[in-house]
């Protein structure tokens, strides 16, 4: 294909993309990715149209999910059909009070507008309904140079490792300040290093699939964003770390899906981030990093945990995660301070409108608290489907923690098949931990407000513990808590 034809092809694809992004009244059902067989356990239809139900079968506890894009608050009729009579069901978030109608093996219910939902039928595996808000990415991409990854003769079947070609496309597109577009396909790759002044746009059925060879990751991560400014990943496509689908079996441990450090002005919007071997996304020594409308799908084991955190803001400031769902085997939304040089503080962090499922903490500060200060940390509007600990501050190093808010939590269940009791509140300063630490910290000013427990509290504990008179916890205000 000559250069002229390639350029024309890119323009045509770009035009098609923009037309496809026009808002419509009917929901748009996202197509299958094609990397694994679809779910046989669940059949889902939306307004009478059959949806593709993905199955992450290689996780310790497999999950199923389908994606929809919805414009506005149009009512959607959801029908879920399974292979057995439905004896019980639950639709989370429970606070929305969604009631369905059961006839034999079919569950019918209605949702109004976008939202993230989990349907639990009998003792079956979880079904995630990911109903995304329509985002006008066309407006966000306006006036930028558009490059199609297919211009680089990339294999889109997932059978060939394409790291070098994709990296070349990233480097060349960044020099233009452009948008690198990934159309439908499976793109197998090792570590990719992002650049400043670049946007990646993932089509609905685009899948960036990590290699299962640990040697293809120089810095133990799939998406590496280091010393980068003005970078975005947009779209409803998927980035997969291949953690439980092969990378762990080949000896990989503690590989991030996304690792950003020394960055400024980073945006992720709409993408699915799934199956890392370790923390899904770590943001370190960075500022103005904002995640919106994310779907984070990690491994969650039957017992204990697997260090598969959701989103970790570490030694960073002015960052946020807004409107997300996180399925994780460890802590869901986390704030840390691993900067031992104490150059950075951790400040102005917001987590808002998040649906969580975890074997450990739903919302947490710590345990790594090496920075001088944590300030203005807010966890708001959190629906907790399952956790071991709901609200956590573990100050195990030397720091000062202030202006922390846990507000508008809806906790559906506490469950942890380990030895320790679950906890609603766990604020602790200590020098006794699984690692060497000092516990020379202070916590002063925590607001716990409007916390609603939607299950019984049998066996659930709470604790607020200082180390001593000097390193202690002060000014914790708890108001508006209910148990239903």
Sequence positions of predicted segments:
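Bacterial Sec-dependent N-terminal signal peptides
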Residues: 1-26
């Amino acid at each position: 294909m000559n250069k002229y034809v390639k350029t024309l092809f890119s323009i045509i694809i770009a035009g098609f993309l923009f037309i496809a992004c026009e808002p419509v009244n009917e929901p748009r059902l996202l197509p299958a990715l094609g990397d694994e067989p679809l779910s046989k356990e669940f059949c889902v239809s939306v307004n009478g149209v059959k949806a593709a139900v993905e199955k992450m079968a290689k996780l310790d506890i497999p999950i199923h999910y389908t994606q929809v894009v919805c414009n506005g608050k149009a009512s959607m009729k959801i029908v879920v059909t399974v292979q057995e009579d439905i004896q019980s069901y639950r639709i989370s978030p429970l606070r929305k009070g969604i009631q369905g109608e059961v006839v034999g093996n079919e569950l019918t219910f209605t949702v109004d507008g976008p939202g993230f939902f989990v349907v639990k039928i009998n003792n079956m595996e979880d079904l995630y309904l990911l109903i995304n808000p329509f985002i006008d990415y066309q407006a966000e991409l306006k006036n930028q140079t558009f490059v199609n990854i297919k211009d680089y003769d990339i294999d889109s079947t997932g059978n060939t490792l394409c790291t070098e070609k994709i990296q070349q496309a990233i480097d060349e597109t960044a020099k233009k300040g452009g948008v690198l577009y990934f159309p439908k396909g499976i793109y197998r790759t090792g570590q990719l290093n992002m650049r400043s002044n670049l946007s990646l746009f993932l089509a609905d059925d685009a899948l960036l699939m990590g290699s299962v060879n640990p040697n293809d990751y120089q810095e133990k991560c799939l998406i590496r964003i280091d010393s980068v400014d003005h970078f975005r990943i947009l779209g409803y496509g998927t980035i997969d770390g291949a953690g439980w689908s092969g990378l762990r079996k080949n000896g990989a441990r503690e590989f991030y899906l996304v690792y950003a450090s020394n960055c400024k002005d980073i945006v992720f919007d709409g993408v699915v981030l799934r199956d890392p071997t370790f923390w899904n996304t770590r943001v370190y020594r960075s500022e103005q990093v904002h995640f919106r409308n994310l779907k984070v799908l990690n491994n969650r084991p039957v017992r204990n945990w697997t260090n598969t955190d959701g989103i970790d803001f570490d030694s960073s400031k002015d960052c946020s995660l807004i409107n997300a769902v996180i399925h994780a085997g460890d802590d869901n939304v986390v704030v840390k301070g691993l900067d031992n040089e104490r150059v950075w503080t951790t400040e102005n962090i917001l987590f808002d409108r998040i649906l969580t499922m975890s074997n450990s903490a739903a919302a947490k500060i710590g345990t790594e608290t090496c920075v001088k200060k944590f300030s203005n940390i807010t966890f708001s509007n959190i629906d907790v489907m399952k956790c071991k600990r709901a609200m956590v501050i573990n100050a195990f190093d030397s720091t000062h923690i202030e202006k922390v808010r846990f507000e508008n939590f809806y906790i559906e269940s506490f469950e942890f098949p380990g030895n320790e009791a679950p906890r609603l509140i766990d604020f602790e300063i200590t020098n006794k931990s699984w690692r060497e630490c000092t516990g020379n910290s202070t916590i002063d000013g925590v607001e716990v407000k409007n916390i609603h427990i939607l299950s019984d509290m049998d066996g659930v504990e709470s604790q607020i513990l200082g180390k001593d008179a000097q390193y202690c916890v002060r000014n914790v205000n708890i108001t508006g808590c209910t148990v239903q």
